[in-house]
Amino acid sequence: MNKTLLDILVCPVTKASLTLSKDGTELISKVGGMAYPVRDGIPVLLETEARTLTADERLDSGSAK
């Protein structure tokens, strides 16, 4: 994902910054505890499409997955 785009995008719920997952398939909101899917290179920033991070993922200093 383009770094400039990643710098602009925020969590739609908390307005906190997002981090790209290690495998590039999700955008992670550590503050909100949510992971938003990236489908065909397009972030899907809908709360209804997000999943809740597991306790282990929340503790991970990197990203989910």
UniProtKB/Swiss-Prot annotation:
Q: Which Pfam families match?
A: Trm112p
**InterPro entries xrefs:** Trm112-like (IPR005651)
Gene3D superfamilies attached here? 2.20.25.10
Provide the Gene Ontology terms for cellular component. cytosol
Tree of life domain: Bacteria
Q: Which residues form a coiled coil?
A: none
Which HAMAP family would you find in this protein's record? UPF0434
Q: Which family does it belong to?
A: Belongs to the UPF0434 family.
How is this protein named in the record? UPF0434 protein Mmwyl1_2153
Protein species of origin: Marinomonas sp. (strain MWYL1)
